[in-house]
């Protein structure tokens, strides 16, 4: 084509791309019509086509099914574009292949007769991996991303069909007896690819860009393929940055690169420690790795700020007096020159070894935690109590002196060139005396005698009125039942109903099963079942208790959807029945002065629940039959309710089936 004709053609292609940007759903139709553009000899067509394919397949607005069909159609074109000797074209093709590979892989899994497509896909994969092995630097980052997509595809994913999404393509999609896809070979290849990307971390050259690219894909691999977590975490823990102190001629740029990689590595390890795929042993190893620091050499201060090049005048600052300097030296004993002591500010407070002490150069982190714990406990049992308290007081005073430095008010050397009008600050004699006394007490190993701590007491809260208590209680119960629709289905599963008690409730998890225990207990034993009786009251009809309020709220909830709350109703009525039996068998427990028992509650609320159920019964409602058989007691009034069901022409069969069921499986029923 002539130059003018090529430019005109590219202009029309750009217009087509603008249309796709406006409405990305048109991408499949347009790309099929212009796919032959990639065969033109002009390199500008190939660049445009590679970029357009990458743009279209990376769009989230194109449906997955359309991408799946289009990926197979464009596969040959993508392979031909990757053969072009142009870095820009290859980068776009590799980026496009990150989306193409899992799509074509899924097509091959569901099409056992299309082996030619699988061969073409394998050819594309091998060519990209070969460029990675050659160390083609302009393409290396794109190759790392593509290899991560291949690993995700060739490793088994989530097998539960309820959790997996259709866009998550993994080795689990491959049928057991596939004619040309061997799952074992692909899985071994995925493990080899993991070793390939980790080879960048362990290479001799320190390239921040490539190492960061590898580190950034690792959390994605662990999140989507949890079985890779042990291998990835283990390889990361074997990675150690070079020590800048060992490389005397290390440039500032290399030192900054090490700091950048160290920061990124720490973030990645912390993220992996919080991920669900990491085991407890892996988490412990990660924390031990981080606590030991990646390298123990402090980076030069020249990397943080530029040094002042001018001459520093002696008159620009005041020099500390010898008395102040000697006091600081006594309060901060000389530390070892070990790198760990210099880098860790906490060690500078707690450690008191001198530089010549051999313990200063001993790495405590090399001792296992169990052995260190046993040593500490044994030492604490055998140490002299007075000496122990003396050291504690010294440590307490050292921490206080470092965290709250006080002005000692000692003489300071004033430069001769200082302004004659300068007036020194007033000396606080009390502050000096307190500081001197604390220093003397520290040296004697005893705490200061005049340290007075003011006792602090919280004010007694005002007592709430009965109406205020009722209002707050109503608000708490209302918030609880606002979340009731989230419970869904059964509040308590039948398998856990017998063994679920307040004693074996796990405090770390508070869910619908625990509310099923708490609410019935609030009605019966959790809240007071007694109502204060005034001298003018003769009956309890006008009285109102908190337990009756909970019963009303609970009844309103279960009546709205009784089928999904059957177990909760049975649990509640069983608690009411048990409480009534205890109260009736022990009449002395409710004969206290100024209190009155509300009376039996089981039959009252059981009848209310049954009345709310009856209008919603069906002709063959087996849930009702099982519910009646599980009631703790069948009173005459409850049996009359079943008789009422027998009199209903639409539910006669249900009523007699219920009686038959009770006679067969509930022998005590009359």
Curated annotation (Swiss-Prot):
Subcellular compartments: Nucleus
The keyword Ribosomal protein is assigned to this record: no
Pfam families on file: SYMPK_PTA1_N
One of the GO BP terms on file: co-transcriptional mRNA 3'-end processing, cleavage and polyadenylation pathway
Transmembrane regions: none
Top-rank lineage group of the source organism: Eukaryota
Subunit note: Component of the cleavage and polyadenylation factor (CPF) complex, which is composed of cft1, cft2, ysh1, pta1, swd2, pfs2, dis2, yth1, ssu72, and fip1.
Its biological purpose: Component of the cleavage and polyadenylation factor (CPF) complex, which plays a key role in polyadenylation-dependent pre-mRNA 3'-end formation and cooperates with cleavage factors including the CFIA complex and NAB4/CFIB.
Family recorded in the similarity comment: To yeast PTA1.
Protein name: mRNA cleavage and polyadenylation specificity factor complex subunit pta1
Gene name, Swiss-Prot/TrEMBL: pta1
């Amino acid at each position: 084509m002539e130059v003018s004709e090529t430019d005109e053609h590219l202009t029309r292609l750009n217009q087509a791309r603008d249309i796709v940007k406006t409405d990305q759903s048109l991408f499949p139709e347009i790309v099929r019509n212009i796919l032959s553009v990639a065969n033109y000899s002009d390199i500008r067509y190939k660049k445009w086509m590679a970029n357009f394919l990458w743009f279209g397949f990376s769009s989230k607005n194109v449906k997955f099914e359309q991408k799946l069909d289009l990926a197979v159609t464009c596969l040959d074109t993508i392979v031909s574009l990757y053969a072009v000797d142009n870095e820009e074209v290859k980068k776009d093709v590799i980026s496009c292949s990150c989306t193409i590979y899992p799509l074509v892989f899924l097509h091959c899994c569901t099409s056992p007769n299309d082996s030619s497509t699988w061969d073409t896909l394998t050819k594309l994969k091998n060519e990209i991996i070969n460029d990675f092995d050659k160390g083609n630097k302009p393409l290396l980052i794109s190759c790392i991303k593509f290899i991560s997509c291949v690993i995700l595809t060739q490793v088994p994913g989530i097998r539960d069909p309820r959790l997996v999404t259709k866009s998550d393509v993994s080795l689990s999609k491959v049928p057991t007896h596939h004619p040309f896809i061997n799952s074992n070979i692909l899985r071994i290849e995925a493990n080899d690819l993991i070793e390939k990307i980790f080879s960048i971390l362990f290479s001799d050259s320190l390239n921040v860009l490539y190492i960061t690219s590898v580190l950034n894909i690792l959390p994605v691999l662990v999140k989507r393929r949890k079985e890779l977590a042990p291998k990835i975490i283990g390889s990361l823990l074997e990675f150690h940055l070079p020590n800048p102190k060992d490389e005397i001629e290390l440039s500032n740029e290399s030192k900054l690169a090490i700091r950048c990689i160290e920061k990124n590595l720490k973030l990645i390890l912390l993220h992996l420690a919080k991920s669900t795929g990491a085991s407890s042993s892996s988490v412990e190893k990660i924390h031990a790795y981080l606590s030991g620091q990646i390298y123990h050499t402090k980076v030069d201060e020249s990397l943080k700020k530029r040094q002042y090049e001018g001459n520093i005048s002696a008159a620009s600052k005041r020099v500390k007096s010898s008395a102040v300097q000697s006091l600081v030296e006594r309060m901060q004993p000389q530390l070892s020159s070990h790198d760990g002591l210099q880098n860790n500010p906490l060690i500078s407070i707690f450690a008191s070894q001198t530089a010549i002490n051999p313990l200063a150069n001993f790495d405590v982190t090399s001792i296992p935690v169990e052995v260190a714990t046993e040593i500490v406990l044994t030492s604490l049992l055998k140490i002299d109590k007075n000496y122990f308290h003396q050291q504690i007081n010294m440590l307490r005073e050292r921490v206080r002196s470092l965290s709250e430095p006080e002005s000692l008010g000692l003489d300071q050397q004033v430069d001769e060139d200082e302004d004659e009008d300068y007036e020194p600050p007033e000396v606080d004699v009390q502050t000096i005396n307190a500081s001197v006394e604390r220093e003397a007490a520290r040296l004697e190993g005893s705490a200061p005698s005049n340290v007075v701590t003011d006792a602090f007491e919280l004010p007694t809260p005002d007592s709430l009125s009965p109406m205020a208590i009722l209002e707050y209680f109503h608000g708490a119960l209302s918030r609880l039942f606002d979340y009731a629709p989230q419970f869904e289905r059964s509040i308590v599963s039948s398998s856990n109903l017998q063994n679920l008690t307040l004693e074996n409730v796990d405090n770390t998890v508070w869910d619908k099963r625990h509310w099923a225990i708490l609410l019935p207990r609030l009605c019966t034993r959790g809240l007071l079942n007694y109502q204060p009786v005034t001298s003018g009251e003769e009956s309890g009809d006008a009285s109102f208790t908190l337990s009756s309020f909970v019963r009303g709220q609970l009844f309103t909830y279960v009546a709205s959807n009784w089928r999904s709350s059957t177990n909760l109703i049975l649990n509640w009525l069983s608690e009411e029945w048990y409480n009534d039996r205890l109260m009736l068998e022990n009449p002395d427990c409710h004969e206290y002065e100024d209190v009155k028992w509300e009376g039996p509650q089981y039959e009252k609320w059981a009848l209310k629940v049954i009345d709310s159920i009856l209008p919603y019964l069906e002709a063959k409602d087996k849930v009702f039959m099982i519910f009646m058989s599980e009631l703790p007691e069948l009173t005459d009034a409850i049996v009359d309710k079943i008789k009422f069901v027998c009199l209903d022409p639409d539910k006669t069969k249900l009523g007699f089936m219920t009686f038959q069921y009770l006679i067969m499986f509930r022998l005590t029923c009359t």
